């Protein structure tokens, strides 16, 4: 199994949680209990700063780091990408290859790029 941790010293992974191969998980990420994360998922904790239009983007550095929190009993499909600071609520299902750009209520089923609410678990 191959996991990529940004230094890998400050990540919380709950009981009975599984992480697929090639997951990119930055420091500070909090993963709850009973989480299923598919392979090749990518969690961002920062982004390129592009706010100053008078300077090239490559010279603006990075935005402030934000922590991602994944609740309990969550299923994250393969190749899901999460923008910085996402909170995935308890009981949520994230369809494969989705791009999460915002947070959703508990027991949401979301999918797409950008991810949209499909329905709630019954």
Segments predicted by a language model, with ranges:
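Conserved functional loop/turn residues at catalytic and ligand-binding sites
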Residues: 102-103, 114
């Amino acid at each position: 199994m191959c996991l990529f941790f940004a230094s890998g010293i400050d990540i919380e992974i709950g009981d009975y949680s599984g992480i697929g191969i090639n997951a990119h998980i930055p420091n500070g990420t909090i993963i709850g209990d009973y989480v299923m994360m598919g392979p090749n998922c990518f969690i961002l904790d920062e982004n390129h700063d592009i706010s100053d239009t008078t300077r090239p983007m490559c010279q603006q550095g990075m935005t402030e780091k934000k922590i991602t929190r994944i609740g309990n009993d969550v299923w994250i499909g393969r190749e899901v990408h999460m923008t910085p600071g996402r909170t995935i609520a308890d009981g949520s299902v994230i369809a494969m290859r989705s791009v999460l750009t915002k947070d959703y209520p508990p027991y949401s089923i979301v999918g797409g790029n950008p991810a949209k609410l499909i329905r709630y678990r019954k």
